[in-house]
Each structure stands twice: as structure tokens, then as C-alpha cells.
Regions:
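Asp-box/BNR beta-propeller blade signature and adjacent active/binding-site loops
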Residues: 3, 9-404
Length: 404
């Protein structure tokens, strides 16, 4: 080498300018992720509390039929071998539109969401059809979907139907997410499903079962629950586009699931939850007096709960109804209880299933009730009948008066 000649020293791969550029990109990505997750955290956990629950519905203008009736019926046979977890909403003409999931078994890859419509004058349900499949959700979300689960339907203030349902991409139900579809034509057509962001971190382990509710400002309250690293309930508040803006804990620990929330005024509501802990097995109850901003600690009721879902509705006359499995260890007895003091005391009014002389399903399980009152003041209960059929009990307040 000649004296004074120029020597170029090259930096090893991964060092120097390349390393600096890589580090800058890494920090930029980290900052972006922090901003996104931080924004989601602030949006979900720091939104102001709502002004109040939407005012409870007024008494229907048409009083429930004077002649008492109670009409139970099984929905038409499903093409799915196993069906479960019905939900329903009233649509135009006094009809009901119901949804449930069905497949070869719960959790199977062939499970789909099925709808059907009930016509009160004809007392008939339409043939089911497939609305949502694992494959259709997977295509729309552009992510792997392993299975589908519970649906829950409700209305927003503008009259649109909101259909929530559970999907799982990895693992069991603890790895669930909640999806939303919206209909502006009473359920004839639906928007593509969209995955709700219910948590800023990973966004998994959120499930739904109970009916959505309305707040006075037009936002939606969605009772949800979690099964990963605990079993507890929450109230998720969504804006008019279905984005989470606030989340409030209903319970803590390892033993509470599937909350059902029933408001009775702009500030007061009661919530019931499935109990999955140590005996004694009892329904859990929580209460709020500030429109869901804070909730009392869960307390066990006197009514039993064999680790099973519950249904509840406040009637237009102020009575509170509860549908539940009236046994601590199994789902063979499905009963109706009524309270005149907003859940402080209860009386059993009827047994839907469990009488020795009543027809029995091959699998003695009667579970996952959904109860609602329509604009004619009639009451509807849908539930899983032996995991093979959905059953519908339709009755009026005159029949209920005879059971009080």
C-alpha cells in the first residue's frame, strides 16, 4: 500500500447507518403502537359516564289480550344437529326475529348463526336460514376464525338492529372476541361483521350473552364477560357507530359470567349473573344507582344456579321476571320467578320444564333463556330444548296474573 493512499473501512452488516435506521424504525413502530394502544385505553376507560339509562318503555297502548293464554311450541327442526343460545327482538308488524347458533356440536367449525321470524297471527316460525358462517366472518375480517358462539340482538335509538356474536380465532372461549352487524331494514339485510375493540391489549376474551340496553344519550350498553385469567362481568358502552368508549367492571374474581342488566329508571338497574364458583350455587346480583358508573359487590341470591345462563325483563307494570334453572346442580328444571319489589323477594310462578309428566328431550337440558315483552304486552321466552331444538313460550299478562 502506498503511503498516503486512501483506505475505505466498511461497517459490518447491521451496524453503522443501517443499525441506526433500524433502531429509528423500531422506535417509531413502538411509539406508534404506544399511541394506538394508549388512545384506545383513554377512549375506553376515560370517557365520561352517560347521563342515564334510557327511560323504561311506557305501558303499551294495547293492553295484553284479556283472555289468558300460554302457548309453548318447538321451533321447526334445524338442519344443525345441535342448537343453542337463542336471542330475539321485536320487528315490524308485531313479529319476532330470533337468532341462535347451531352446528354438529357447540364449538365445532361448522357452527353458524341462524335467524327465523315468528308471526303472532299465524303462530308460526319461518324456516331457518344461514346468516353467518365461520368462513364468511373469516373472509370479511381477513383473519382466521376457528368457531362462532353466542348471538345477542337489540335496537339502537334510531331503530336499527344490532346483532352481536362471539367468534374465536385461537384457543377456547377464553380467546373470544365480539363482532357486530347492523341492519336498517328489520333484519332483511345486514352490514358486514366488524370486530369490536373491547380491550386495548390483545382484544381477546370478551363474550356476550345478555341483551344490549340503551342510554339516554343514544349510546348502547353491552353486558359482556371474560373467561381468561378470571371470570367476571363488565358493561361495555358503545357510541352510535359501535366503538367502545367506556368499560365498567360488574364483578371480579373467578366465578361470575353472562350478566343480564335490567334498568328501571334513568339511574337504577339490577344485574344478574351466572355463578361458576364453589357451593352454594346461587344466582349473583349487582345493583347500580348512578346509571352504571358504579356497581355494588356481587351478592348471592336465594335462587339456585347450576352454572347456567339467566334471562330477565322488567314488565311495563313494574314486575320483574326471571327465567332460570331452579336447581343447584343441573339444567333439568327451567322456571319463571316474579318479583314485585325489583328483585328483593321472589316467588316461583311457573315451571317451563321439569314436570314429571311433560315431554322430555333426549338430552335433559333446558337452558340459556331469553325473555322479552312485546308492544302488545305479551311475553316471549326462548330457550335451548335438549340441545337439539329451540323452544318458544308465548303468554300474556292475563295468564301471568293467574300465576302470581
Amino acid at each position: 500500500m502506498q503511503e498516503g493512499s486512501k483506505v475505505t473501512v466498511r461497517s459490518p452488516a447491521g451496524s453503522g447507518e443501517a443499525a441506526v435506521a433500524f433502531a429509528r424504525r423500531r422506535w417509531a413502530l413502538l411509539a406508534a403502537a404506544t399511541a394506538v394502544f394508549g388512545g384506545l385505553y383513554l377512549r375506553i376507560f376515560t370517557a365520561p359516564p352517560p347521563a342515564g339509562f334510557a327511560s323504561p318503555k311506557a305501558a303499551p297502548s294495547a293492553v295484553s289480550s284479556a283472555k289468558a293464554f300460554y302457548r309453548p311450541q318447538l321451533l321447526p327442526n334445524s338442519t344443525a344437529r345441535s342448537v343453542h343460545s337463542a336471542t330475539a327482538v321485536e320487528i315490524s308488524g308485531g313479529r319476532l326475529r330470533a337468532f341462535w347458533f347451531g352446528g354438529s356440536r357447540e364449538g365445532a367449525s361448522d357452527v353458524a348463526i341462524y335467524p327465523s321470524v315468528f308471526s303472532p297471527p299465524e303462530r308460526t316460525w319461518s324456516p331457518e336460514r344461514v346468516l353467518v358462517t365461520r368462513e364468511s366472518v373469516q373472509r370479511t375480517l381477513q383473519r382466521y376464525v376457528r368457531k362462532l358462539g353466542n348471538p345477542a340482538v337489540g335496537r339502537d335509538r334510531s331503530g336499527r338492529l344490532w346483532l352481536f356474536f362471539v367468534s374465536v380465532s385461537v384457543g377456547g372461549w377464553a380467546g373470544s372476541a365480539v363482532n357486530l352487524m347492523v341492519s336498517e331494514d328489520e333484519g332483511e339485510t345486514w352490514s358486514p361483521p366488524r370486530r369490536l375493540v373491547a380491550s386495548p391489549f390483545f382484544n381477546i376474551s370478551t363474550l356476550v350473552k345478555g341483551p344490549p340496553l340503551q342510554f339516554a344519550d343514544g349510546t348502547i350498553g353491552l353486558p359482556v364477560y371474560h373467561e381468561m385469567a378470571g371470570k367476571f362481568g363488565e358493561l361495555l358502552r358503545l357510541d352510535g357507530e359501535g366503538h367502545a368508549i367506556r368499560k365498567t367492571r360488574l364483578s371480579w374474581g373467578q366465578s361470575s359470567l353472562q350478566p343480564v342488566i335490567v334498568p328501571r329508571s334513568e339511574t337504577d338497574a339490577v344485574g344478574f349473573m351466572r355463578y361458576a364458583g364453589d357451593p352454594p350455587n346461587r344466582i349473583l346480583v349487582v345493583r347500580t344507582s348512578d346509571a352504571g358508573a358504579h356497581w355494588s359487590a356481587p351478592v348471592k341470591m336465594e335462587l339456585p344456579n347450576p352454572n347456567a345462563a339467566i334471562g330477565s325483563v322488567l314488565l311495563s307494570d313494574g314486575s320483574l321476571l326471571l327465567v332460570f334453572n331452579n336447581a343447584p346442580e343441573n339444567r333439568e328444571d327451567l322456571s319463571l320467578a316474579i318479583s314485585k319489589d325489583f328483585g328483593n323477594t321472589w316467588r316461583i310462578a311457573h315451571r317451563f320444564e321439569g314436570d314429571p309428566g311433560s315431554p322430555r328431550a333426549q338430552v335433559s337440558e333446558y337452558s340459556y333463556p331469553w325473555i322479552m315483552q312485546d308492544q302488545a304486552a305479551d311475553i316471549h321466552v326462548l330457550y335451548t330444548w335438549g340441545r337439539s331444538r329451540i323452544k318458544h313460550a308465548h303468554f300474556n299478562t292475563a295468564w301471568l296474573e293467574g300465576r302470581r
